[in-house]
Amino acid sequence: MTVILLRHGVSTSNTARTLAGRAPGVELTERGTEQAAAVADRLAMLPIEHIASSPLLRCQRTVAPLAEKLGLEPDHDERLIEVDYGDWTGRPIAELVTEPLWRIVQGHASGAVFPSGEGLAQVQQRAVAAIRDIERTLAEKAGRDVLWVACAHGDVIKSILADALGLHLDSFQRIAVEPASISVVRYSPHGPSVWKFNDTGADLSALAAAAPTTPTPGGEVPAAANADNGNAGHRDSP
């Protein structure tokens, strides 16, 4: 089973340098809308059979062009929703970096709980559970490997990737997930493997091939050894 983790495109909150959290009405910018269209063009050639998405508007807008091209109805899953940042919601990043909690978020994420909000450990638990549950449901229904998309938010995707990589949550800020980037995780009986990471423009044709059952010796990705692995960006704010 293979999931394409898609972060929403650039939002009005991203450009304003505020922490959107679950605040209503946060739209994509013009650039974010262009990114959503570009992602749809990249992914539409793949045999994607399911789209799950955070219910927040910026994720809905991001997957809409792809869903239209594929003729799929996105499933809005509350477990993929943005972190509940509580009292931090809507505040400028420039203010938040002066808060004592900021250091905990960056270096000891497993112990970070946002005031009147949720903890990052809770976020990882619900997000990973969502991915695994959807994978299981799709596998039982199809009886074979399925390629699907999950559109979510930066910290949510980073927590899923940390789990797939076997990283402790305290290290998840070392993972970069840019707006409209994709990361690809393949789950097998041998465990998860990360095929793409914070990718914003690589060749994805290898994803249309059958999934290998085990990693290839030497670390090469079968049928995609020459594919560009994308560009890692700057470290995300929470």
Residues covered by each model-derived region:
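Active-site-proximal alpha-helix that buttresses catalytic centers in soluble enzyme cores
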Residues: 2, 6-72
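Short active-site segment of divalent metal-dependent hydrolases/proteases
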Residues: 11, 156-157
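Generic structural signal for well-ordered alpha-helical scaffold segments
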Residues: 37-44, 124, 128-139
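Acidic, low-complexity terminal tails and accessory targeting/binding regions
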Residues: 83-94, 140-146, 163-238
